[in-house]
């Protein structure tokens, strides 16, 4: 736990000791899980890529309200945000059974009362829960145009979409112009940062400006197979 504590202090991330303990337990569960939900094999790399990478661009925020983590998979970023922002109600959404089993196990083990796990496709969930969330987030799920279509309908007007991307996001942003216009979303800010490992990252902060048309998201699979261009 000392390494986790030291790394977050070095990045300037504020925390309570209980959050360090829960995060350490989560990382151990992930690295030892039989479900093979991560390519990371060491605690060091997991601390940087699954914890610090998520918290650095939000270290001056006090997120509260409701957040939808689309394609939560191994719990990044949703579980980390649930641990470090206790006033945030987080929905961990994934359609894969092994991911859902792992997430439910960790939520129970850590007694995370502000996190809930849902097994469903994002296209269906966003259609059924229109404008219910203050935030939606995702990492390593899809390109930006697809993310906007499957996430924006679930976010209230004035709410934010927080997408974690690598440094070469400009091409995705150009591709996503139609999706942004159609779904009534605009880019508000790009937060660039560099991990101590030397890897460059960015958080795209987008804002929903108006109600997304009822025809979005399209039926399951279409936003991935035929993204808005």
Curated annotation (Swiss-Prot):
<comment type="similarity">
    <text>Belongs to the methyltransferase superfamily. RNA methyltransferase RsmG family.</text>
</comment>
<keyword id="KW-0808">Transferase</keyword>
<keyword id="KW-0949">S-adenosyl-L-methionine</keyword>
<dbReference type="GO" id="GO:0005829">
    <property type="term" value="C:cytosol"/>
</dbReference>
<keyword id="KW-0963">Cytoplasm</keyword>
<keyword id="KW-0489">Methyltransferase</keyword>
<comment type="function">
    <text>Specifically methylates the N7 position of a guanine in 16S rRNA.</text>
</comment>
<dbReference type="Pfam" id="PF02527">
    <property type="entry name" value="GidB"/>
</dbReference>
<feature type="binding site">
    <location>
        <position position="139"/>
    </location>
    <ligand>
        <name>S-adenosyl-L-methionine</name>
    </ligand>
</feature>
<dbReference type="InterPro" id="IPR029063">
    <property type="entry name" value="SAM-dependent_MTases_sf"/>
</dbReference>
<dbReference type="InterPro" id="IPR003682">
    <property type="entry name" value="rRNA_ssu_MeTfrase_G"/>
</dbReference>
<dbReference type="GO" id="GO:0070043">
    <property type="term" value="F:rRNA (guanine-N7-)-methyltransferase activity"/>
</dbReference>
<feature type="binding site">
    <location>
        <begin position="122"/>
        <end position="123"/>
    </location>
    <ligand>
        <name>S-adenosyl-L-methionine</name>
    </ligand>
</feature>
<keyword id="KW-0698">rRNA processing</keyword>
<feature type="binding site">
    <location>
        <position position="71"/>
    </location>
    <ligand>
        <name>S-adenosyl-L-methionine</name>
    </ligand>
</feature>
<protein>
    <recommendedName>
        <fullName>Ribosomal RNA small subunit methyltransferase G</fullName>
        <ecNumber>2.1.1.-</ecNumber>
    </recommendedName>
</protein>
């Amino acid at each position: 736990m000392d390494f986790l504590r030291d790394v977050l202090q070095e990045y300037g991330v504020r925390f309570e000791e209980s959050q360090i303990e829960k995060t350490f337990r989560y990382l151990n569960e992930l690295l030892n899980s039989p479900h093979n939900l991560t390519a990371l094999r060491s605690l060091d790399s997991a601390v940087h890529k699954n914890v610090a990478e998520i918290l650095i661009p939000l270290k001056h925020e006090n997120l509260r309200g409701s957040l939808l983590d689309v394609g939560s998979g191994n719990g990044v970023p949703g579980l980390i945000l649930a641990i470090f922002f206790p006033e945030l109600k987080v929905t961990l959404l994934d359609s894969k059974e092994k991911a859902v089993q792992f997430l439910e196990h960790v939520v129970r083990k850590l007694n995370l009362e502000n996190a809930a796990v849902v097994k469903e496709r994002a296209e269906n969930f966003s259609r059924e829960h229109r404008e219910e969330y203050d935030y939606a987030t995702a990492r390593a799920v899809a390109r930006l145009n697809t993310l906007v279509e499957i996430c924006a309908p679930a976010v209230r007007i004035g709410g934010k979409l927080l997408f974690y991307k690598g440094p070469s996001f400009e091409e995705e942003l150009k591709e996503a112009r139609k999706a942004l216009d159609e779904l009534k979303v605009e880019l508000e800010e790009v937060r660039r940062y560099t991990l101590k490992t030397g890897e460059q990252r960015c958080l795209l902060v987008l804002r929903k400006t108006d109600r997304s048309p009822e025809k979005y998201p399209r039926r399951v699979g279409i936003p991935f197979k035929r993204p808005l261009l």
